[in-house]
A protein has these predicted regions:
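Enriched for short, Lys/Arg-rich terminal
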Residues: 5-19, 23, 36, 42-43, ...
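Blade/loop signatures of beta-propeller domains
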Residues: 30-31
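PIN/NYN-family metal-dependent endoribonuclease catalytic core
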Residues: 1-2
Length: 78
């Protein structure tokens, strides 16, 4: 739910960020561990999650299962 709130925040404040998030999600669905946004695996309490850069400050944080993509956050730095 937090990630949806993040997404709604961007829809209200910066359409360019929404476009970038959508591009990153599309790319992540195709190639989860390489591509746009400099994908990197997260460590410690976020082990199993990956991040991609939306901007210098904000990250798309996600996990991939066999058949789905879980978006954990798309605002701030994990």
């Amino acid at each position: 739910e937090e990630s949806w709130d993040d997404y709604l925040y961007w829809q209200e404040t910066d359409k360019r960020i929404v476009k970038k998030i959508n591009e990153l999600i599309k790319d992540t669905r195709r190639t989860p561990f390489e591509g746009k946004g400099k994908p990197e695996p997260l460590k410690h309490n976020l082990s199993g999650f990956w991040s991609r850069r939306i901007t210098e400050e904000h990250r798309l944080v996600y996990a991939v299962t066999d058949d789905s993509l879980l978006i954990a956050a798309c605002r701030y730095h994990y």
